Curated annotation (Swiss-Prot):
InterPro entries: QueA, QueA_dom1, QueA_dom2, QueA_sf. PANTHER family: S-ADENOSYLMETHIONINE:TRNA RIBOSYLTRANSFERASE-ISOMERASE. The lineage of its organism: Bacteria, Bacillati, Cyanobacteriota, Cyanophyceae, Nostocales. Belongs to the QueA family. GO terms for cellular component: cytoplasm. It comes from the Bacteria. Monomer. Transfers and isomerizes the ribose moiety from AdoMet to the 7-aminomethyl group of 7-deazaguanine (preQ1-tRNA) to give epoxyqueuosine (oQ-tRNA). One of its GO terms (molecular function) is S-adenosylmethionine:tRNA ribosyltransferase-isomerase activity. Keywords: Cytoplasm, Queuosine biosynthesis, S-adenosyl-L-methionine, Transferase. Its EC number is 2.4.99.17. It comes from Trichormus variabilis (strain ATCC 29413 / PCC 7937). This is S-adenosylmethionine:tRNA ribosyltransferase-isomerase.
Length: 408
């Protein structure tokens, strides 16, 4: 009788494990219900007053309950010798409003610069934007976001000094073609030789907020990290929004240092996964740069026994994408790496991240770190504990021990 019971229990355990594995690859396995009032419409003030849910050790097979702390407690949670990797991308004023020659109103969202002053953009309404259509944009008034020159979006092509725009209150663009992959349009902006659109976005564009933020009173600078330097993103790396200059200084004082990568966050970050078998999902491309100095810091930290803590899923994609060959190297280019349960980690050991949308590639990435079922249980606890979700929401810290990682 005992043998029969034991056999039955083994069969049930095997069946449950198989079902859980199947859900790891099923879109339905990443669904959860979020009350609308839990979607943060405004950021915490000050930044580091946001809440921090700490997922700690799970090395004995028994889950330790998460700890509920405040983000400014981070220096007391991390260890001296740990290294935080941060994304220094800067959100550009990529949303522009204009009109066609017929007077019809137009909204566009810049996605990426394909060549100098020639941009791929989403257009709304988009059905009637045929080749040759001209769009006229009116100035919104100069802003002080401090767009700087960067290798990815140079302010002027080599050999051409910037020249003044003839009409400083108006900007025009012409539709060159439709992009089949995105449904967007390739727009050629009509500017004097040597003049860059990036220089003019402060005047003609707006910072685009995510579609789920509908009633925000946030200033533009609140949707930038305090260490943002390289313009090119159309969405903020939101895990970094919680840091203040004072907190960064306190971390350095504790010998918890920081290194930087650049990943220009694209519109794909908001798009849900739509295929039922998540393994067949085609990830969007994003531009990344991993400097040699950051690679050296990471290798030195690991050699000294420190832990590599990624600040945000963008950093995870950048580091793991650059280490796809098995060894992290200096890198500049695009990645379409899709991380989901079963992924074999190369660089990242811990993660600071916000709470993500159901059925999103970001939720799958975090699931690859600590397990899908465990993550969804943590999300339910966060909802019950009144945490704020998504871009302006609270954060969670996944320590390496939570994954069973033996850090050196």
């Amino acid at each position: 009788m005992k043998k029969q019971i034991l056999q039955l229990n083994l069969e049930q355990t095997s069946s449950a494990a198989a079902e859980d594995t199947n859900l790891d690859c099923s879109l339905a396995g990443y669904d959860y219900v979020l009350p609308p009032e839990r979607i943060a419409q405004n950021p915490a003030v000050p930044r580091d007053s946001s809440r921090l849910l700490v997922v700690n050790s799970q090395t004995t097979g028994k889950e330790t309950p998460p700890l509920h702390q405040i983000f400014r407690d981070l220096p007391d949670i991390l260890r001296p010798g740990d290294l935080l990797i941060m994304n220094n991308t800067k959100v550009i004023p990529a949303r522009l409003y204009g009109r066609k020659s017929s007077g019809a109103e137009v909204e566009i969202l810049l996605l990426e610069e394909r060549k100098f002053n020639c941009w791929l953009a989403l257009v709304k309404p988009g059905k009637r934007f045929k080749k040759g259509t001209q769009i006229i944009f009116e100035g919104l008034g100069i802003r002080n976001l401090g767009i700087k020159n960067s290798p990815h979006y140079p302010l002027s092509p080599e050999g051409f000094p910037p020249s003044p725009v003839p009409n400083p209150h108006q900007l025009t663009a012409t539709v060159l073609e439709t992009d089949k992959a995105t449904g967007g349009r390739l727009l050629q902006f009509d500017l004097p030789e040597g003049e860059s659109l990036v220089q003019l976005l402060d005047k003609f564009g707006e910072i685009p907020l995510p579609p789920y933020i509908t009633a925000s009173q946030a200033a533009d600078e609140q949707y930038q990290t305090v260490y943002a330097e390289q313009p090119g993103a159309i969405a903020a790396p939101t895990a970094g929004l919680h840091f203040t200059p004072e907190l960064l200084e306190k971390l350095r004082d504790r010998n918890i240092n920081q290194a930087f990568i650049t990943l220009h966050v694209g519109v794909g970050t908001f798009r849900p996964v739509e295929v039922e078998d998540v393994a067949t999902h085609q990830m969007h491309e994003e531009w990344i740069e991993i400097p040699a100095a950051t690679v050296a810091q990471i290798k030195a930290t690991k050699a000294a026994g420190g832990r590599i803590i990624a600040v945000g899923t963008t950093v995870v994609r950048a580091l793991e994408g650059a280490a796809a060959s098995g060894d992290l190297q200096e890198f500049c280019g695009k990645t379409n790496l899709f991380i989901y349960p079963g992924y074999k980690w190369q660089v990242v050991e811990g993660l600071i991240t916000n709470f993500h949308l159901p059925r999103s590639s970001l939720l799958m990435l975090v699931s690859a770190l600590i397990g899908r079922e465990r993550l969804l249980n943590i999300y339910q606890e966060a909802i019950a504990s009144q945490y704020r979700f998504y871009s302006f929401g609270d954060a969670m810290l996944i320590l390496p021990e939570a994954r069973g990682v033996n850090s050196h």
